[in-house]
Structure formats: C-alpha cells, structure tokens
C-alpha cells in the first residue's frame, strides 16, 4: 500500500529522537512537510538537520508541551513556515517510575513523590490536551485532518511501579474517544496507538537479561523497533485510514494477548 502525504503538514511532538524521529522520517519520506516539536533544543536541532540532509522538508521548534504559551508559539511558527497543519501526532511522553508506597517490615518507608506524579501527568496527559486544543482550529481551517495520540499497552492491564504513567495512558484513551465523537463529523479523525516493548534509547540502558525477558514475553519474539510504531502512526494519518475513528491500535507484537 502506497501512502502519499504530498501537500500535507504534520506535527510530531517528542520528535527529537526514538519513535518521534522515526515517525517524522517516515512522514517526510512519504511527502509530508514535518514540524518537530521537542523541549530538547540540541537534540531537536540535530534531528531536523539530519532529516534535512536526507532531503526532507523539516522544521524544528523548541516546545514544552506542558506550557500553553510554548505550544502557541510552536503552532504559530509551524503555520508561518508551512501554511497550515493537517496532522497532529501527540507522541511526547516521559516516565518517573516508583511504587505508590514502599513497605518494609509492615511500615511505609517511601513511595512515589507527588512531584513525579504531577510531572508525568503534565507531559503525557495535559500536554496532549494542550497541543490538541491549539492545533484543532488549524485542522478545521484545512477542512479536516488527523490526530493520533500515544497510549500504551499498560493502559489496559496496569504495570507495577507506574501509577502515574498508567493513569496518563488510560486518560489518553478516554480523551481520544471523546474527541473522536466531537470532531468526527468535522472531518477530523482521532485515534491512538498502544505500543508494547519498543527498542529505544531508554530501553537500551536496561540490562541484557531484562531485555531478553521483555522479548520473551512478546509473542512475536522480539522487541518492537521505532519504525514499527512509525508505520502505525503513518497509516492512521493516511487517507487510507479515513473511516478509522476512535480506535486504539496495538503495536505490541501480541504482548497484550501474551500476558
């Protein structure tokens, strides 16, 4: 299946590396002009430079998705450069893992800091809301568009030590379904992808036995690659996915059924 994004403008949050960078590359290779939004200035500029040298049309905008003013500036810069926005991929996300409480000898000895809970909520959930609310008027101005949000397989079954992360990813599914109802008749589809274990810079720091265990838990027998997730994002952003709305697409190698 050939996917053509010629004439389309896509925004990818968290686009400086990993899944976001792979997605930006795939969109650009298929004809889209791409805006990378990321708060990591050096990494984002380097990513945009790399993609530009590959012949793609890319803009990097230093953006903090937790700050409405920063997002508004990113929207303004993107529209000024490319003339509009057709696709929003809410990919930015962080983790701050800890148990709700730590118990030793029957006594609570610690737990998840409130600041860590709030930080993950701000990026992974509120950031999705802020970016989407800022971009939707521009999708409407183009007669419609695509919004794809990042959730996770853990939104379904939970994950030890990830109260904050799981809460955000479950919330993203809820927002996705609400927005699919609210925007569908206006030509905007809203979907989500739910990655499983993906080989990124973060997982590369894990011990080899842990990575092997993660692969073994996945029925496909391997970790996913950033390109696997990028392909899913691009499909849901494509004209071929016009009648898919409110869906959550698993990109997990069968992890959900294997656990």
For the regions a language model picked out, list residue spans one by one.
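Alpha-helical segment proximal to the catalytic Tyr-Lys
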Residues: 137, 180-182, 242
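Active-site helix of classical SDR
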Residues: 132, 168, 176
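Short, small/polar-rich loop/turn modules that mediate ligand/substrate recognition or access, typified
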Residues: 184, 189, 244-246
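Residue(s) in the substrate-gating loop at a strand-loop-helix junction
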Residues: 152
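C-terminal helical subdomain
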Residues: 129, 192, 215-240, 244, ...
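Short C-terminal tail/terminal secondary-structure segment
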Residues: 1-4, 157, 233-234, 245-259
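Substrate-binding pocket helix/loop in short-chain dehydrogenase/reductase
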Residues: 99-118, 214
């Amino acid at each position: 299946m050939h996917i053509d994004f010629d004439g389309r403008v896509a925004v990818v949050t968290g686009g400086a590396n990993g899944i976001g960078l792979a997605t930006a590359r795939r969109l650009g290779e298929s004809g889209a002009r791409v805006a990378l939004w990321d708060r990591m200035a050096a990494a984002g500029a380097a990513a945009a430079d790399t993609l530009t040298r590959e012949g793609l049309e890319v803009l990097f905008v230093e953006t903090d998705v937790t700050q409405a003013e920063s997002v508004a500036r990113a929207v303004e810069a993107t529209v000024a450069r490319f003339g509009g926005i057709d696709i929003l991929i809410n990919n930015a996300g962080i983790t701050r893992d800890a148990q709700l409480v730590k118990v030793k000898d029957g006594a609570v000895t610690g737990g998840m800091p409130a600041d860590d809970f709030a930080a993950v909520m701000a990026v992974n959930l509120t950031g999705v809301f802020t970016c989407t609310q800022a971009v939707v008027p521009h999708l409407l101005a183009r007669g419609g568009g695509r919004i794809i949000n990042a959730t996770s397989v853990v939104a379904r079954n939970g994950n030890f030590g990830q109260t904050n992360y799981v809460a955000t990813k479950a919330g993203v599914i809820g927002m996705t379904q609400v927005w699919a109802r609210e925007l569908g008749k206006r030509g905007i589809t809203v979907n989500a992808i739910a990655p499983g274990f993906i080989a990124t810079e973060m997982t590369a720091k894990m011990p080899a036995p842990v990575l092997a265990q993660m692969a073994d838990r996945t029925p496909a027998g391997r970790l996913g690659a950033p390109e696997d997730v990028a392909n899913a994002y691009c499909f849901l952003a494509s004209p071929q996915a016009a009648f898919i709305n409110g869906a959550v697409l698993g990109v997990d190698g069968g992890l959900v059924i294997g656990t």
